[in-house]
């Protein structure tokens, strides 16, 4: 079997596997599927360097489904900014305007979980998802022994933390899987994530998962320090790691980091760094967020594990923008439970800087524990068999002449197959138009048969375009066509994300959608640059893209019926620009009051400070009302609030 035939069989096996396990609509008999898997295993045993990461023999998709209901978080689950050394930590602290009183704790390498409690009872559990909406895994959460199902606190509260698998338990799980001839988990993080997303809750239960809280989302707590919040949460019955402390200054933070780094191998669970957070909640509220991160906390990452291997070749990848990226082909090396066979070389200027050659021994790390990269070349170990890595002159895909601008080498052929295919794959991906069933292999198959050649051509596909293609039967074709039709009515921000504009990701796309609606591509440089979290680089990228693609976006609007979320804010009322805190029991849910305040241009905070303008209180208002009176903040009941919003 040749490589091309092997990859075609991988695609077919995945098609059959998804149909059987995810859609419950078999496209082949059990005997045919088993025979195909045996063919793949024979090839892979003989060609270990050619194994596709997409092969069904390399993953456990049949037991990990994506068929969970979606559940919205009451408050967004943010990512964290990463810092990797002392200078970056000090730069972060300077931006955070904080030089003292930091809360620190280990950053466990697991799966984030959001728990919702109401009236003291656990009512739901959800994965992080996209930060705003996660997967409803409540049934599995109830199988995690150390998560309290009832707590003494009766107000509604979201408690967030990390689900981990202990290293010893991870080894036992893999030993059991090996005995069952099942593929092994690469690391405890993947095992924890997979264990949470089981359709069979008994599997989750037997995995012995542990939950460590690290924060809260929606809450009505009245503390002034994050450390007080966490102490309260742990007193409700949650686990506390023994390395949690307050640091008076950055020097103490650095000392704690060094201590924790020494404990890295001794800890029973995987860690990839230390969380550093401003402890003062009022300052946290003042600092706020970028479009992606809270400004008041950072992940001080550990140095990635580093190993030596040999560079045996260089592959050239053509991105959807045409940029040529050299990728080092490595002799396989295990880094922190992950077998690494390739590493980024970024660009040819980086190759020159490293003075790296084919057959060199190199040091490779997983930068940020995610992307493998080469950091050092051991020139003293050269044996005379090394070969220079030449700058390419022709595109490896279409053979057209490349534009060499130094750092950037680019294929300018807009019809280059790799550019088009990668653009289409991105366009239909989960975070973009999310066309179910139109994955990477299917896109490549359709492009190969000239059924799709542009982004727009996706919406012109017909039933007869699929007839005769391997693996497609009537029901499968109709399902895919229905998914394409549904994608015509996707959210505007998904469409903006799908266009692949440089520097504009999902978060920025949502900001554009909310700020400008359907007119997002008709704005000025100043309008873009003035958006919160944007800057000159993003604004320039948007201006250039919209200038070139203005007419094309108009044409897309004729093909699509985009859902547009527009946040209408009244800017001439007495509430505009005012900060509210809501406490006590009101006649309607707090979310309704919050939505009204925000619509009128106000802001709702979770804690009372000198910057609070109004406290809206109801029955059984607690310490927030008392604190507001101490600070002489204006306190109004529901009747006074109703009069205020009429003005």
Curated annotation (Swiss-Prot):
It is an enzyme of class 6 (ligase). NAD(+) binds at residues 30-34, 79-80, 105, 128, 162, 301. The keyword Cytoplasm does not apply. PROSITE patterns: BRCT, DNA_LIGASE_N1, DNA_LIGASE_N2. Belongs to the NAD-dependent DNA ligase family. LigA subfamily. SUPFAM superfamilies: BRCT domain, DNA ligase/mRNA capping enzyme, catalytic domain, Nucleic acid-binding proteins, RuvA domain 2-like. Its cofactor is Mg(2+); Mn(2+). GO terms for cellular component: cytosol. Keywords: DNA damage, DNA repair, DNA replication, Ligase, Magnesium, Manganese, Metal-binding, NAD, Zinc. This is DNA ligase. DNA ligase that catalyzes the formation of phosphodiester linkages between 5'-phosphoryl and 3'-hydroxyl groups in double-stranded DNA using NAD as a coenzyme and as the energy source for the reaction. It is essential for DNA replication and repair of damaged DNA. Residues 570-647 form the BRCT domain. One of its GO terms (biological process) is DNA replication. Zn(2+) binds at residues 395, 398, 411, 416. The gene is ligA. GO terms for molecular function: DNA ligase (NAD+) activity; metal ion binding. It comes from Campylobacter jejuni (strain RM1221). Pfam families: BRCT (PF00533), DNA_ligase_aden (PF01653), DNA_ligase_OB (PF03120). The active site is at 107 (n6-amp-lysine intermediate). InterPro entries: BRCT_dom, BRCT_dom_sf, DNA_ligase, DNA_ligase_AS, DNA_ligase_CS, DNAligase_adenylation, DNAligase_N, NA-bd_OB-fold. It catalyses: NAD(+) + (deoxyribonucleotide)n-3'-hydroxyl + 5'-phospho-(deoxyribonucleotide)m = (deoxyribonucleotide)n+m + AMP + beta-nicotinamide D-nucleotide. CDD domains: BRCT_DNA_ligase_like (cd17748), LIGANc (cd00114). Its EC number is 6.5.1.2. Disulfide bonds: none annotated. It comes from the Bacteria.
């Amino acid at each position: 079997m040749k490589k091309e035939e092997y990859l075609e069989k991988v695609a077919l096996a995945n098609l059959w596997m998804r149909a059987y396990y995810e859609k419950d609509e078999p496209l082949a008999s059990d005997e045919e599927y088993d025979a195909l898997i045996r063919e793949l295993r024979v090839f892979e045993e003989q060609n270990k360097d050619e194994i596709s990461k997409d092969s069904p023999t390399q993953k456990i998709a049949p037991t990990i489904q994506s068929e969970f209901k979606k559940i919205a978080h009451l408050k967004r689950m943010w990512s964290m900014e990463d810092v990797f050394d002392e200078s970056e930590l000090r730069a972060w602290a300077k931006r955070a305007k904080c030089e003292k009183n930091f809360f620190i704790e280990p950053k466990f390498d697991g799966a984030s979980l959001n728990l919702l409690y109401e009236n003291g009872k656990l009512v739901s559990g959800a994965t992080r998802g996209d930060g705003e909406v996660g997967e409803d895994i409540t049934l599995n959460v109830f199988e995690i022994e150390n998560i309290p199902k009832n707590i003494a606190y009766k107000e509604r509260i979201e408690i967030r933390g990390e689900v981990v698998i202990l290293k010893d338990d991870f080894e036992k799980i893999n030993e059991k899987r090996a005995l069952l001839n099942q593929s092994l988990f690469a690391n405890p993080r993947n095992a924890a994530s997979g264990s949470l997303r089981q359709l069979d809750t008994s599997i989750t239960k037997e995995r012995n998962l542990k939950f460590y809280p690290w924060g809260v989302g929606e809450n009505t707590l009245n503390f002034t320090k994050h450390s007080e919040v966490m102490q309260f949460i742990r007193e409700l019955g949650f686990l506390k790691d023994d390395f949690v402390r307050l640091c008076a200054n950055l020097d103490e933070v650095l000392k704690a980091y060094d201590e924790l780094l020494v404990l890295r191998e001794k800890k029973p669970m995987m860690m990839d760094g230390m969380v550093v957070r401003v402890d003062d909640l009022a300052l946290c509220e003042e600092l706020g967020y970028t479009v992606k991160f809270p400004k008041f906390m950072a992940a001080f990452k550990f140095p990635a594990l580093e190993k030596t291997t040999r560079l045996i070749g260089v592959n050239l990848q053509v991105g959807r923008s045409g940029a040529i990226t050299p990728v080092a082909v490595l002799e396989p090396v295990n880094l922190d439970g992950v077998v690494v066979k390739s590493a980024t070389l970024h660009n040819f200027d980086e190759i020159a800087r490293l003075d790296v050659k084919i057959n060199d021994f190199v040091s490779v790390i997983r930068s940020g524990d995610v992307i493998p990269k080469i950091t050092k070349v051991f020139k003293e170990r050269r044996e005379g068999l090394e070969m220079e890595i030449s700058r390419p002159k022709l595109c490896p895909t279409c053979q057209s002449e490349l534009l060499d601008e130094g750092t950037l080498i680019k294929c300018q052929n807009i019809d280059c197959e790799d550019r088009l295919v990668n653009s289409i794959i991105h366009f239909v991906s989960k975070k973009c138009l999310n066309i179910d069933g139109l994955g990477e292999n299917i896109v490549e198959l359709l492009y190969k048969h000239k059924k799709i050649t542009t982004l727009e051509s996706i919406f012109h596909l017909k039933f007869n375009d699929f007839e005769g293609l391997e693996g497609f039967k009537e029901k499968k074709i109709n399902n895919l066509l229905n998914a394409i039709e549904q994608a015509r009515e996707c959210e505007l921000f998904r469409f903006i994300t799908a266009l692949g504009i440089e520097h504009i990701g999902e978060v920025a796309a949502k900001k554009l959608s909310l700020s400008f609606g359907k007119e997002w591509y008709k704005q000025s440089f100043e309008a873009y640059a003035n958006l919160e979290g944007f800057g000159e680089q993003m604004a320039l990228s948007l201006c250039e893209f919209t200038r070139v693609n203005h007419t094309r976006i108009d044409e897309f609007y004729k093909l699509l019926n985009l859902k547009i979320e527009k946040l209408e804010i009244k800017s001439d009322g007495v509430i505009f620009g005012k900060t509210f805190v809501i406490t006590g029991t009101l006649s309607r849910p707090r979310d309704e009051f919050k939505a009204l305040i925000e619509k009128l241009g106000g802001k709702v905070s979770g804690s009372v400070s000198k910057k609070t303008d109004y406290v809206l209180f109801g029955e059984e208002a607690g310490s927030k009302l008392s604190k507001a009176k101490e600070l002489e903040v204006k306190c109004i009941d529901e009747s006074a609030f109703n009069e205020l919003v009429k003005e």
